[in-house]
Amino acid sequence: MSKKEAVAVWTPKEFKGNDLIPYEAAPVQVANIPLVGNDNIDANDMVVPALNLLHGTSKAVTDGVEDAAPGRFMHSGTEQVLPEGDVRLIVVHYHKSNALFPKEDDRYANLETCIAQDGIEGTVYGLCEECKKCTEWDNVNSKPPLGAEVHNFVCMTSLGPVILRMSRSTFKAGSKFLSTKASSGKNFFAHPTVVRVTQEPKTLPTGKVTNYYALQMAWQTTEDVPEGLQLAAYELYKSLAQKHETGNLKSNDDAAADAGFELD
């Protein structure tokens, strides 16, 4: 009997990819050894790592991080690169944010990195409603916004909580997933979510056509997450919601231009 069969009370349909469903809702501790070392860790100092989709320009790829390759996922906290393939996990919490990362382009002259975790007020340019750098198109020159609106999905996985982001070309895919959830009358964590990687052509400003990787999200409505795991997800949700409300829901790559906002 495998370890999963020995501990899991739920055996969903076999998944061909990276199955990150946390079949054990609580971390496994060595027998008779209590969890120690958290006494002096401030909850406000804790950050949620991101599960980033790598591209050819991603720092991990250009720096030659082991196994890093376009189209694969990397855990920003441990720099663990997952095997090639789709991912299955459980979405727990959602929030929208805005992010602006200056590029080597005249449009970004004298601009600074600005991140609005709550989608309301940025770290540099203040209220997003007044700034509009992440939402307003340059219709005269047919240019997209300088920054980007971002869908942030905090997920419960066997690697711990992670943030999965969808922006720019994958923003609509994230919106479609949200619409499915909203119309269902269910919690995100009622069913597992499959994150698929797709390869699509993209025409560069030079006219050259290249391939880029994008994300699609699908709710596995044929699989019901068992009550015990849903309760664990709900407890995590309450913690995340409180952090978001107080402005403390942060990721350890929020200040990095390679955070995934502008790469998809």
Language-model segments: residues:
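OB-fold ssDNA-binding interfaces and closely related basic DNA-contact patches used
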Residues: 1-159, 206-211, 220-227, 263-264
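Accessory, usually C-terminal, subdomains that scaffold auxiliary metal cofactors
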Residues: 185, 189, 194, 198-263
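Polar/charged alpha-helical tracts
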Residues: 49-52, 63, 129, 176, ...
